[in-house]
Amino acid sequence: RRCFNQQSSQPQTNKSCPPGENSCYRKQWRDHRGTIIERGCGCPTVKPGVKLRCCQSEDCNN
């Protein structure tokens, strides 16, 4: 699986996930800096107030 891993509005970058990892995620929240977006491999548990979208295809988490 390949997932995007750039932060917020940085230029697009992606990486290959470890063998057996078939999910990508996109996590979004707000703080004093504004809206923060984090992307990567897997499907993490998030705190309340954090939007999480997980998906299972190549580069699906932009």
From Swiss-Prot:
Domain of life: Eukaryota
Cellular location(s): Secreted
Biased composition (Polar residues): 1-16
Lineage of source species: Eukaryota, Metazoa, Chordata, Craniata, Vertebrata
GO CC aspect terms: extracellular region
Gene3D superfamilies: CD59 (2.10.60.10)
Tissue-wise expression: Expressed by the venom gland.
Pfam family, one: Toxin_cobra-type
GO molecular function term, any single one: acetylcholine receptor inhibitor activity
Natural source organism: Laticauda laticaudata (Blue-ringed sea krait)
Protein name per the record: Short neurotoxin C
Keyword ATP-binding annotated: no
Alphabetically ordered keywords of this record: Acetylcholine receptor inhibiting toxin, Disulfide bond, Ion channel impairing toxin, Neurotoxin, Postsynaptic neurotoxin, Secreted, Toxin
Similarity comment: Belongs to the three-finger toxin family. Short-chain subfamily. Type I alpha-neurotoxin sub-subfamily.
Disulfide bonding pattern of the chain: C3-C24, C17-C41, C43-C54, C55-C60
InterPro entries noted in UniProt: Snake_3FTx, Snake_toxin-like_sf, Snake_toxin_con_site, Toxin_cobra-type
Disordered: annotated segments: 1-22
Role noted for this protein: Binds to muscle nicotinic acetylcholine receptor (nAChR) and inhibit acetylcholine from binding to the receptor, thereby impairing neuromuscular transmission.
